[in-house]
UniProtKB/Swiss-Prot annotation:
Main enzyme class: transferase
Regions that span the bilayer: none
Annotated protein name in UniProt: Thiamine-phosphate synthase
Keyword Lipid metabolism: no
Protein encoded by which gene: thiE
UniProt feature coiled coil, ranges: none
Xref: InterPro entries: Aldolase_TIM, ThiamineP_synth_sf, ThiamineP_synth_TenI, TMP_synthase
Amino acid sequence: MSIAHIVDWRLYVVTDAGLSRGRSHRAVIEAAIVGGATVVQYREKHASTRQMIEEALELRDLTRRAGVPLIVNDRVDVALAVDADGVHVGQDDMPVALARRLIGNKLLGVSAHNLSEALQAVRDGADYLGVGPIFATTTKPDAAAPIGLDGLRAIRQHVSIPIVAIGGINQANAADVMRAGADGIAVVSAVVAADDVTAAARQLRALVSVTQEKAL
């Protein structure tokens, strides 16, 4: 049985070595957790497998002590090696159904850019969706065209599993994203590249929480 519906998805922080301004993943995530990060995704596209395992183990130690789920992007082998809480796969990564067979009951997130991809991910066994990009983003140069708040609403109307919105989300638009139906926001540069990571995370967490409370 999936634990996705009891996970606090409000502030999902994704690592990015290229944006962290020379700070280690550990330093950035430690500060983000202090600021209120509720989920952490380890995303590393350029390191060796050995380095990824070493870095993910460090994050696993941090997140476990904080009670925050650790998700590994794409690499099922790394997630299993460090006993992460889950894996997140994109449309060009390992097929969702195969990832599910390999990871068992761990959390499985899937990126979706439109309703068709979202519905297929649900059928294949996704626990949650990473929907976007909502807005234009410079974090992923190869990102698809933004789907906007209307695209997010359309997916929300047809799926019941948790949705984490991603892509160009920051302090100026986080509340709008939550009002459009997201269960949480996934952020990269808005936290990882901030001068004060803890303060940036705290501000975003507060915005998301207030918006959720008003919706109840």
